[in-house]
Regions:
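A short N-terminal beta-strand-loop micro-motif at the entrance of redox/enzyme domains
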Residues: 15-20
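Functional-site microenvironments in short loops/helix caps that host divalent-cation chemistry
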Residues: 2-6, 43-190, 194-199, 206, ...
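Short capping motifs at secondary-structure boundaries
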Residues: 21, 28, 34-43, 69-76
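Short, mixed-charge, low-aromatic patches
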Residues: 23-26, 160-162
Length: 214
C-alpha cells in the first residue's frame, strides 16, 4: 500500500492485509441516489444523466445511503453496506496486480481530452480493472470511511487498517473529471472535511457479510 516515490502522504509503502470484503462494480449513480431520495424523502437534486455517478454528495450523505441500503439488503439477505476503507479501496483499485500505478497499467491513458468536460461521465464507459471494477481512479473522487492523516502510514497496522481514531478531514480516493491525472494513481490520497459537497465527489458502496447470519 502506498508508493515510495509518490507524494509525502503515500509513504512509506508498506504491506497490508485486508479481510474479505465486497465492493460495487460501479460508482453510485444518479439513478441509485434517486431511489434513495424517494425512499427517504430527501430534497430532489437535478442531474443530466441518470447513469452518471451521483455527485455533490458529502461524507454524511454517503453514510446515510449505506445505512439505507443495509436496511434494504437486510430484507433479502445477510449483507451490510458501508464505505470502504482506504486500504480496501487501494487493494481493489490495483485489480490484483501488486505495485501497479493505475488500475489499467503503469502509464496514463491517452483519452484525457474527455467527451464530458462539464461533469462526470456515465459509469462503465471504459474497460474494468482486473477485478471487474469500473471507473476506479476516475470520474469522481470516492469517499472512504477513514479519517485522513498525512502521516498515518508510519503507524498503520499491518492488518485491516481503519484509519486514525479522529481527525478533521475524511479520506477520499481516485481521480475525478476536473483534476490532473496524478490523482488517478492507485496510491494517490485526497481528503476534504466531511460536510463539504463538490461536483467531483461521489462514492462507491462497499460491504461485508453479517456474521450473525452466516
Amino acid at each position: 500500500m502506498g508508493q515510495e516515490n509518490g507524494r509525502d502522504d503515500e509513504r512509506p509503502a508498506h504491506r497490508v492485509t485486508v479481510a474479505p470484503f465486497l465492493l460495487c462494480r460501479f460508482q453510485t449513480t444518479n439513478a441509485h441516489w434517486e431511489a434513495f431520495r424517494k425512499a427517504t424523502g430527501r430534497e430532489k437534486v437535478e442531474f443530466a444523466h441518470e447513469t452518471a455517478p451521483a455527485a455533490w454528495v458529502n461524507w454524511f450523505d454517503a453514510m446515510a445511503y449505506c445505512h439505507w441500503l443495509s436496511a434494504e439488503w437486510g430484507m433479502r439477505g445477510a449483507l451490510r453496506a458501508r464505505l470502504p476503507t482506504e486500504a480496501e479501496w487501494e487493494f481493489a483499485a490495483r485489480g490484483g496486480v501488486e505495485g501497479r500505478l493505475y488500475p489499467w497499467g503503469d502509464a496514463p491513458r491517452v483519452y484525457q481530452a474527455r467527451r464530458w468536460k462539464d461533469g462526470p461521465e456515465p459509469v462503465a464507459g471504459f474497460e474494468p480493472n482486473g477485478y471487474g471494477l469500473f471507473d476506479m481512479c476516475e470520474n469522481v473522487h470516492e469517499w472512504c470511511s477513514d479519517w485522513y492523516d498525512a502521516g498515518y502510514y508510519a503507524v498503520s497496522p499491518a492488518e485491516n487498517p481503519q484509519g486514525p481514531a479522529h481527525g478533521v478531514r475524511r479520506a477520499s480516493r481516485g481521480g475525478a473529471w476536473r483534476h490532473h491525472v496524478k490523482f488517478s494513481r492507485c496510491a494517490a490520497r485526497s481528503s476534504i472535511p466531511p460536510e463539504f459537497r463538490y461536483a467531483d465527489y461521489g462514492f462507491r458502496v462497499g460491504g461485508e457479510a453479517v456474521k450473525e447470519a452466516i
